[in-house]
Amino acid sequence: MRHLRDLPDEEIIIASGSEILELVVNATMGDDHPEPPTPFGTPSLHDLYDLEVDVPEDDPNEKAVNDLFSDAALLAAEEASSPSSDSDSSLHTPRHDRGEKEIPGLKWEKMDLRCYEECLPPSDDEDEQAIQNAASHGVQAVSESFALDCPPLPGHGCKSCEFHRINTGDKAVLCALCYMRAYNHCVYSPVSDADDETPTTESTLSPPEIGTSPSDNIVRPVPVRATGRRAAVECLDDLLQGGDEPLDLCTRKRPRH
């Protein structure tokens, strides 16, 4: 056993199991056993941040650290981590390196937390006003270049027609308004003439009257009697033109009777 190896070099007479147990207990739990290691104490806020360095008195870094971790905050942290539970004695925390200091009385004050630093100027992509101005200029340019005019002669002096001609390259193209004004007699021609109105244009009545007989050279259809056998066809559409017999699509020849 491991514990028996630590015993002194002497003759051991094993009489019973109780003597072996007593020897093991004396070897492991005796007065000469080493003390267990104690953990390190929790470092205080002063030990972490209050570093003694040789710096000039007007060093801005030291002033910033002192303003952030004031003596009141350090003393309050030491008081919270102190093992003493007496509140009266914890108000005075003696230290060998800083002397005896008392936590000063704290009072509220109004602080301005606004940032007055000048940031970098915004870029062109982030300038919202510039984006709005560019969009308004683009809309204004489109509205000025594309407009529905109503010139006396359709297609001449019309800004909308010029816009389409520049974009398409066709010099004869017209806008929708000029096209409807130029060809309104085709778009809005009446379907039939009214009985009580006189036609304004020299044209025949619509629809025309049917009174003439057809000429003699017109080819007339001749009726043909269908035979019992189905005639040869070129496509399936010819088979669907008539007949009561079912459609036979098989390729074998039918026997002749």
Curated annotation (Swiss-Prot):
Residues 94-103 have a biased composition (Basic and acidic residues). A motif (PXLXP motif, interaction with host ZMYND11) lies at residues 104-108. One of its GO terms (molecular function) is zinc ion binding. A motif (PXDLS motif, CTBP-binding) lies at residues 246-250. Signal peptide: none annotated. A motif (LXCXE motif, interaction with host RB1 and TMEM173/STING) lies at residues 113-117. This is Early E1A protein. It comes from Human adenovirus E serotype 4. The lineage of its organism: Viruses, Varidnaviria, Bamfordvirae, Preplasmiviricota, Tectiliviricetes.
